[in-house]
Curated annotation (Swiss-Prot):
NCBIfam families: aroC, PRK05382.1. Its cofactor is FMNH2. One of its GO terms (cellular component) is cytosol. SUPFAM superfamilies: Chorismate synthase, AroC. The keyword Ubl conjugation does not apply. The gene is aroC. Reduced FMN (FMNH(2)). It catalyses: 5-O-(1-carboxyvinyl)-3-phosphoshikimate = chorismate + phosphate. This is Chorismate synthase. One of its GO terms (biological process) is amino acid biosynthetic process. Pathway: Metabolic intermediate biosynthesis; chorismate biosynthesis; chorismate from D-erythrose 4-phosphate and phosphoenolpyruvate: step 7/7. Keywords: Amino-acid biosynthesis, Aromatic amino acid biosynthesis, FAD, Flavoprotein, FMN, Lyase, NADP.
Amino acid sequence: MRYLTAGESHGPSLTTIIEGIPSGLELSSEVINLELKRRQGGYGRGARMTIENDKVSITSGVRHGKTTGAPITLIIENKDHKKWTDIMAVEDLPDKLKRKRKVIHPRPGHADLVGGIKYGYSDLRNALERSSARETAARVAVGAVAKCLLSQLGIETMHHVSVFGGVTIDIPETLTYEELRTKAQKSELSIVNSEQEVEIKTYIDQIKKDGDTLGGVVQTIVTGVPVGLGSYVQWDKKLDAKLAQAVMSINAFKGVEFGEGFAMGYQKGSEVMDEIIWSEEEGYSRKSNHLGGFEGGVTNGQPLLIKGVMKPIPTLYKPLQSVNIETHQPYKASVERSDPTALPAAGVVMENVVATVLAQEILEKFSSDTMKELTKAFQDYTNYTKRY
C-alpha cells in the first residue's frame, strides 16, 4: 500500500491517490467524512474551521460500497479557495496581482525561509501553502481507509492528550483502554479528566488574547495487534522506526516515544523489561507494557503505546523578530490565519498516520488481493501465534 497527497492550503482541493487496498473492503465517503470532522473539532481551533466543512469525494477505486482493488482517488475541496483565486492562480498574472498576499517576512518555526532558500522562491507563500497543516486533512482521509481495514481484523486505534500546554493530565491507572477512548472522545480537549477542562480552556483563552500558542503531548494506543509485525533483520524493517518517522512527519511534531520512552533513561533494566507469561487461552503475553508493544522493532502482542510531542503553532498574532528577504532588514514575521492550539486535532492526525503505517505493514506481510484472502491469512497467523 502506498499513497501520495497533493494540494495547497488555499488551492482548489487536496487530492490523494491510494494504491494497494484489497478488493472487497466496505468503504463509503461517510466513514471518511466522520474522521475528517474529528480533525476539525477541538477547543482552540481558529476561524478557518468555520469556513471549511471537509467532505471527501471518492472518484475511483470504489464501486457499490466496496473497494475494487484499483487505485482509490480521494478529493477534498478547499472552500476557502474562492477568496484566493488570483493569489493561487495557475496561470501567470501581472506583477501587481502577483504581489497580493506575497510573503517576504518568514515566520520563525515554520518552513517559510528554509523552503524559500531550498527552492529559490521570491514569494515564500509557495513554501507555506504546501507545508501548511492543511495537508493533514488528506492524510486523515488515508487513515480513515486504513482504519476500516484494520477494524475488519480486530485492530482498533484511539488517542488522548496527556499534556496540554504544560498541564499534565491526571489519568487514573484503573481506566481501561475503552474507558480512555470514551472519555477522550467526549472531551473538546481530548483529555480523560473532565475536572481539568475548565482550567485548560481558561488557559487557552488567555493564550489567544496574548497572541500566543500552545503545544502538548498526545498518546495513540492501538489494540488487537498480533505478535510479529515488523522485523529486526534490517534497520529499515523495524516497525517502531517506521511509526516514529510517520509521527515525526506530522506538522509541528518534534518528538516521539514508545511505552515509557525517555523515562527509561532514569530506570534500571529490571524495572522496565516486560516479563513473559503464557496461558492456554491467550498463548504468550506480558505482565506489563513498559516497552509499548515492541521488542527489537517487532510487535510483541501487547497494545502499542506511542506518544508524540507537538510544538506550539509557529504562527503568532504577536509576531516574533524576522527579516525582510528583499531588503535583509529586520522586520516582524508575517501573520497568517492560525489557531492558539490544534492539539486535539493533531491527536486525530497522529491516530490516522499510525493506522496507515500499520495497514501498510499488514498488507506487506499477508496475502491480500481481496479482503476475504487477507482476513483468512491474518486469522490463520494469529491462531499460529497462540499455538507456538
